[in-house]
Amino acid sequence: MKNTSDYGVLMMNLGTPDAPQTPEVRRYLREFLSDSRVVDLNPLIWKPILNLIILTIRPPKVAKIYQQVWMDEGSPLLVLSERLKEKVKEALSEKKGQTVPVELAMTYGNPSVEVAANKLREQGVKNIIVIPMYPQFSATTTAAAYDRLMKSLKNCPHWPSLQLLHDYADHPMYIKALSNSVRAQWDKQGERRHLVLSYHGIPKRYVTNGDPYARRCETTSRLVAEELELGDHEWTHVYQSRFGREEWLKPYADATLKALPSMGVKKINIISPAFSIDCIETLEEVTLELGDEFKNNGGLAFDYIPALNDTPDQVALYVNLIEQNSKQWT
């Protein structure tokens, strides 16, 4: 197969510690929480809190959580992202009849953006399609990925041409893929259940200041509900992962799941559309913490619907996104 593709692809996800141990988790959290896109507080206030309190208390606790979900091959986020990358590369190369360079990078941690970008350069890539693996745009995720990419190219003598994907919150193939996952779960369990769509939260202040994330999440939920022909009483939209005392996007997932049984909703399925790949937030927070919250307050059945991961639907979606963004080079 020829290696003369007109472009290469850089897939970017958030990041993960190198190991489920306290030192590695502390190193990762320091990099992640030092990004002003993630925490935009005055550094004179935030840095002492981060270094003296959070990075002292949180790493041992978070390391134990990672140990519960760690796979034999490594971090679930990295392992599953790599699997998706390889399948996307194979599918793209087969369609084009030539090898298409595809690399994976993490905004924080490894593989770094610098390493991934260098690999593309070494393969002679002059045009790069950048695919942040976040279905709903947010400055805290997608823009942070762009920042890291631009920083990595700062000292590059010859910049490649870049095509940056904004998001795909309303892409028909994405909505269809999520809906297919829900239908498959319903078939497996032999019944339709109330569907909870849970998204990673961000401070409400960010949205007030212009971040479109909440609107994009709401769009995804509405389209999935329409695709599944759900009535308003058959689905619920929530936000998880609240941190600190500041008000975040509502409704809060934990409070909502605690209340649902008293409203007559005893059986639910929950899906997290904002996560293209399963990770600590889905495998531990959703599956275990939110599941316990629901069942401890009268819920009878709780089943998490996995992220799209490296499924054929997600591979086809990413191939389509790449093809749509490569037209000027093909």
Curated annotation (Swiss-Prot):
Q: Which residues are involved in binding Fe cation?
A: 200, 281
Pfam families in the cross-refs: Ferrochelatase
Which leading EC class covers this enzyme? lyase
Q: Which UniProt keywords apply?
A: Cytoplasm, Heme biosynthesis, Iron, Lyase, Metal-binding, Porphyrin biosynthesis
- Among the record's GO biological process terms, what is one? heme biosynthetic process
Q: Name one GO molecular function term.
A: metal ion binding
Subcellular location as annotated: Cytoplasm
One GO cellular-component annotation of the UniProt record comes to: cytoplasm
Q: In which pathway does it act?
A: Porphyrin-containing compound metabolism; protoheme biosynthesis; protoheme from protoporphyrin-IX: step 1/1
Q: Which CDD domains match?
A: Ferrochelatase_C, Ferrochelatase_N
- Give the E.C. number(s): 4.98.1.1
Q: Can you state which reaction this protein catalyses?
A: heme b + 2 H(+) = protoporphyrin IX + Fe(2+)
Q: Which PROSITE patterns does the UniProt record give?
A: FERROCHELATASE
InterPro entries listed in its UniProt record? Ferrochelatase (IPR001015), Ferrochelatase_AS (IPR019772), Ferrochelatase_C (IPR033644), Ferrochelatase_N (IPR033659)
In UniProt terms, what function does this protein have?
Answer: Catalyzes the ferrous insertion into protoporphyrin IX.
Q: Member of which family?
A: Belongs to the ferrochelatase family.
Q: Which PANTHER family match?
A: FERROCHELATASE, FERROCHELATASE, MITOCHONDRIAL
| Database matches in HAMAP family | Ferrochelatase (MF_00323)
- Name recorded for this polypeptide: Ferrochelatase
Could you tell me which species this protein originates from?
Marinomonas sp. (strain MWYL1)
Q: Which gene encodes it?
A: hemH
